[in-house]
């Protein structure tokens, strides 16, 4: 097992990465506030891992809540289901919530923990690659709204993130690929050597090599922990973690949440960001080709939905949380390993990019 730390003064917390961690009661115990625990999971993960975790936490008074799986259920309605379960169970501030699942469950449970009685502790137990390398770390919690993704939420840090790489053995190949979009993102924005390593070892990741999985999870979490420690509430460098997300969130919202997995939309959005950089003279043809090739090798889309127009994108992108004073701001790569935030890219450039990437 390896341990990383997100350094946020008195709110600092560990990230544990290893195999078989779901069965380690000693790992959970220091991060559980009292005797009561509510495990929230979904109907895909529950048959696989809920009983395992219940057995691990056998010494506690455990309630469980099983929600429907999928991005379509990351809603205020699901949030209210969690609230109702907590209230009906007369849970207090000494209850610890545990998010057992992927990014949707983690975001939902984190938001519920932030709001219930103005804040109760929670633990992230991510079971998908995307949640293990990205969404479980950093305290972003939210639900979607029909008019925009992650528009209702809070910054609220977990007490711990417990990453069991064995959970990836039951992950469908499409979900594994979706998680790779976030892994590749870290190479593009932060670490050129890591990007090169991914080019050489993508097949090891796809064959679920424990060493390769540990490597990518630890590297991504280390980068994110560093960024979050510098900029917890996304006023500066943390915005770089949104490479591909402004285009990608527009795809998700326009297509209907769940039609495109988050990672698939981010992959297409990353290509659109790279093409924007190319047209602005920020990025070389060679780097754009390498980005596309690695995304393709990871079984991710490199073209966006054919039925989306420029107006469809802008309708959603102007609601993006990075926008300021009505002006669009985009994270754009300047080289593999380096990116920055750019304001007010010309509409003619965006139109050309959107036309070229469908």
From Swiss-Prot:
It comes from the Bacteria. It catalyses: 7-phospho-2-dehydro-3-deoxy-D-arabino-heptonate = 3-dehydroquinate + phosphate. Its EC number is 4.2.3.4. Keywords: Amino-acid biosynthesis, Aromatic amino acid biosynthesis, Cobalt, Cytoplasm, Lyase, Metal-binding, NAD, Nucleotide-binding, Zinc. One of its GO terms (biological process) is aromatic amino acid family biosynthetic process. The keyword Metal-binding applies. Zn(2+) binds at residues 182, 245, 262. Catalyzes the conversion of 3-deoxy-D-arabino-heptulosonate 7-phosphate (DAHP) to dehydroquinate (DHQ). This is 3-dehydroquinate synthase.
